[in-house]
Amino acid sequence: KLYGPSGSGALYIRQDRMEEMQPFMGGGDMIREVSREFVSYNDSPHKFEAGTPSIVEAIGFGVALEYLMKIGMADIQKHESKLKVYAEKEFENLDWLETQGNAPDKGAIFSFTMQGAAHAHDISTIVDRRGIAVRAGHHCAQPLMEHLGLNATCRASFGMYNSTEEIDQLTSSLEFAYELLG
């Protein structure tokens, strides 16, 4: 997570791979020359930058990166790792909470369901009304959900701005939701 404005981000592509790739959309500044018979693209990376760039988002993304570098990525990772370990221990105490994706090196993101008939959207609504924001749905991963035999999960993401107290608040809210729905 890089905390930039919505729609901002970066993609690294090795130079040799970039030369092999063809643009998948068209627009200004990516084309060197165009006629009815052919199109000649600008050199990389410009041939992939169609249309008007998102200038404000790029500036905001740069400021976000400067902020992260000031804090220090190692310190952020250490904090998020502590939150992950804390949340794992808290969630293990909820025997009715089923977490998905428990790879040892995963980030501080938890997808979960409750045993029983509770739907992820119902869980997220109850948790939200208690001041905790989680996502609910298929998270743009419908084939994975189908493979797991699920129609939706709730997802909680912890970052540099979160605390163990907020994990406690989430845990308490999940217990409340389970009392209502479980």
Indicate residue ranges for each PLM-predicted region.
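Pyridoxal 5′-phosphate
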Residues: 1-182
